[in-house]
A protein has these predicted regions:
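Alpha-helical transmembrane segments of multipass membrane proteins
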Residues: 8, 42-46, 66-67, 71, ...
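Membrane-helix interface "capping/anchor" motifs
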Residues: 46-55, 179-186
Length: 186
């Protein structure tokens, strides 16, 4: 069913709905990259609710990723023209689409976890989203720092160094937001 709905959305995009959505998002963002990223993230969260991973990617790749690539290419940040690689845009939209699985109110993963823990699905979804703040920040890094996705990295040692620094940064950020490092922080 979800894949069929993804096919309907892709069909609508091929009929010109994608251009209408792009112009609407362009008007809403007003050329502000942060507003553009926020609108794209919210659209990905809304469109990704209740979808399996494959259908989620099909929808994000056909609706939100082209918007991000097309509109971000004309934005200048601190005197430098922003160029968003296609892979960074796809990862950005896909991450937020997948985040919809544990974000209330739909949050299918939160409902499953709440049934196991015998708690409220909404409270479980909110707690899960707080644990996923790292996942909400990481796609922003894909857009502004292409090294994290190894875009333009020429040497293996540099790639290994970036990998370990990214893992260390994500672990540090997760321990900060969750209140744990080696022991519970009070």
């Amino acid at each position: 069913m979800a894949t069929a709905s993804a096919g309907i959305i892709v069909g609508c995009v091929s009929l010109g709905l994608g251009q209408q959505i792009t112009s609407f998002v362009e008007i809403l963002s007003g050329g502000n990259i942060f507003l553009l990223l926020l609108i794209t993230a919210l659209a990905s969260l809304l469109l990704g609710m209740g979808l399996p991973t494959t259908a989620n990617y099909i929808i994000m790749a056909s609706l939100t990723a082209p918007i991000l690539v097309q509109l971000a290419s004309g934005i200048v940040v601190h005197g430098v023209a922003l160029a968003v690689p296609l892979i960074a845009a796809h990862l950005y939209c896909f991450y937020f689409g997948i985040l919809a699985d544990d974000t209330p109110p739909v949050g299918l993963a939160a409902y499953a976890a709440a049934a196991i823990a015998d708690t409220s699905p909404i409270a479980t979804g909110i707690q899960g989203f707080l644990y996923d703040i790292r996942t909400a920040i990481l796609p922003l890094m894909f857009i502004f720092n292409h090294d994290i996705i190894l875009w333009g990295i020429d040497s293996v040692p540099e790639g290994i160094f970036l990998f370990f620094m990214t893992v260390l940064g994500c672990m540090s950020f997760a321990s900060l937001t969750q209140g744990w490092f080696i022991a519970k922080n009070t």
